[in-house]
Amino acid sequence: KALSKSASQLTDADYVAVTAPADGVITELSNLGSPNSYRVVINHGCNLYSVYMVMNKVTGVLASLASQASNSGYLKTNVKVKAGEEFGRQGTNMLDFNVFDGTTWLPGFQNPQAYLTLDTWKPYTADYLPFFSSEIRTAMEAQLQKTSSPRVGKIDYDIAGTASGNWFLAGTNGYAGRLNSEYENATTMIGSGSVPGKNDYSWSHLAIAPHQVDTKAWVFSSGWWLDPKGDADQAALVVASGQVTPDKLTASSGMVVYKLAQLSYTPPAGVAENPPGSMAPWPIGYTIITGRERGVVALQVNADGSLSLELNTSITSISGFTAFTAAKRTYN
């Protein structure tokens, strides 16, 4: 309910408790760059971790660290927590929650090397529902927007030899967004974080995948939209009648040009749309619709499995794009 209000209308009573899903040790409390955005990591043992992102307030068992956390980018902690104990509060935005199981690798990631330099935990992302009791699981499922299986969604859509999945710009070393040449010529240790000359590490990222809720729709998401330094954006990738879907686009398909359009939604029958300005989640079971046209993108899977693309936001007609130009990029 708090997300239906503007930030200026929120009171302390609107913030809800963030509690531990199981016994464990809080090993990290990080400030994500603003006074109301924190990351918390809980180690539950047996290589199982739960991670909370963009948490608003540090409270409960972490209250004594609140002041220190607000002034520090990263705190390594050792705070025991019991299932159900509060360690934070949430009110101004949705809370990210993930479970990582270090014993299980997501089978839909085709490029393990890409995750060695940053977000090394991502390939271990787990479906968290089976870890909860039937009572809690039922309550959680009742709030999930996606009504089809898997209810928590999917991030590993890599299909070798097709355009589907997660990609990284050729010449870069995966998720961290650093150039291979930096590693080849390094004389000191290269860390993660900011990339020299770029606005964000995601400048080199690309994803072409089904929408996280309405999997009939395809999404084109690029860390480099118009600015080669990085200006992440995404749009609906519109598969026209007679066109092959990205998961069926192979080297034999040649170059295929798709329209891009603004992503929007329509609620299920009988459910009202969110009011303008609302931060509340879109309604459960919504479907994707497209808005204004945002250009075209040409895709071509190469014989070596790499992907060539060219994004053109100045034209909206598929027939207006006939061949790659010097603006073509290649991803692995």
Kindly give the residue locations of the regions a language model identified:
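Short glycine/threonine/proline-enriched tight-turn/helix- or strand-capping micro-motif at secondary-structure
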Residues: 1-20, 29, 143-154, 181-205, ...
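Conserved "cap/hinge" positions at secondary-structure junctions
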Residues: 22, 28-31, 85, 90-91, ...
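Conserved, short, structured surface segments that act as functional micro-motifs
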Residues: 37-44, 70-156
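Tryptophan-anchored aromatic micro-motifs
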Residues: 159-178, 182, 307-310
